[in-house]
Amino acid sequence: MQSIVPYHTYEYGDQPEVIATVPGRFHLLGEHLWFAQGDALSVAIDKTLQLSVSRRPDNNFRVYSVSLDDRRRISSTNMRYRKEDRWVNSVKIVIASFFDHGISVSGLNFTVLSEIPSDASLGTPNALKVATGLVLRQLFAPNLTLLELADIIEYANIQGLTSYGHRADIYTALFAKAGTCIRTEYKKKTVIHCAFPPEGYSIILTDSKIPRSIAREELGLALRDCIDAYEFVKKLPDAPKNMHNLTEAFLQESDIPEAVKRRVTYVIRESAAIDTAIKALESGDNQSFVRLIARSQEGLRDRFEISAPELDWLVKRTNELAKNEPDSFVCARLTGKGFGGCTYSILKDEQIPLFTDKMADYERFFGLLPQQYTVKSADGAVVQVLQ
């Protein structure tokens, strides 16, 4: 990735003091379980966002996005979320969260340079929030632990955006290691690393290019239905106090709507899949891992109902490449919010051209031109101090 320093210097006339480089990410399993405090299995990718910063003589903030060619000014007296501020809200809410935690922050010049594909559910807003937190920590709160910083960023999401994204977004950006996937243990606030993918396999991310404007409202309604179903079961008189002990047998024996059973069954199965997936990866049990991914995709399509024909098509084309190979690690699933965004495909290196060739059919069927990225698992965020 090109250096951010010349852009910052040209824009503000001074050298940056601190640069944070944060990876994008995708989720293998579990990203939709945040409301159930479930774990997630994720991968940081070698597409990054850089954020540089230098001090100002006042208490205001300027933010320049190289990628968007957009410049914004932020007043220290107005840190509330505003829809019209769009991407810069990610910076504002983290600064506000530092204020709310009693940490003084003086005026700064920010420059943003990102190579993470936008609008593809690969973590661009999350990377900007984490990068903002890291540079503020370096300048104003160096004694903060990374776990404490993660809490501040999560607070920013909840208070600033009224958003409850999975804690795994933040933990993956901070704690990932190259050559591994990372399990975020939601309740414990800990992580586990596991080698991923196996040797000889590559990760292909395919952006479906489904317009977000079309999907956003439908996605919101679907997620609301899933959360309501879980809360409905949680309030049943004989529901277990610890919902992690909830079983499919309990659902089948309960007099509850079928739609509720269907959605909560997905939560139970996806939660269990995280444990099984780690064991499969550690033991080299490719078949078990591939079955888990296929079952998760089926659940997102049929139980959570947040897939789309375009995503299903991409998954199916991947799985076709694994036919007659019983020990293959080839698998695919949607990743992120759903109703659009990306799928990930784990393919043998020699299968990549075969998969890429199928994209002409995708364009013909759906009238959309997909974008593909071959990525590698990457390390978590890095902070560089220049002055």
Question: Which residue ranges define each predicted feature?
Answer:
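Short, mixed-charge aromatic SLiMs
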Residues: 117-121, 153-163, 228-235, 301-302, ...
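A structural signal for short, well-ordered beta-strand segments
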Residues: 110-112, 206-208, 343
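Short Gly/aromatic-enriched secondary-structure transition segments
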Residues: 37-44, 222-223
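Gly/Ser-rich oxyanion-binding loop with an adjacent helix/lid
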Residues: 1-20, 32-39, 84-197, 358, ...
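C-terminal nucleotide
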Residues: 1-29, 50-89, 180-333, 346-387
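Short beta-strand->loop micro-motif that forms the acidic, two-metal-ion catalytic signature
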Residues: 340-346
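Short catalytic helix/loop segments, enriched in acidic residues and glycine
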Residues: 44-50
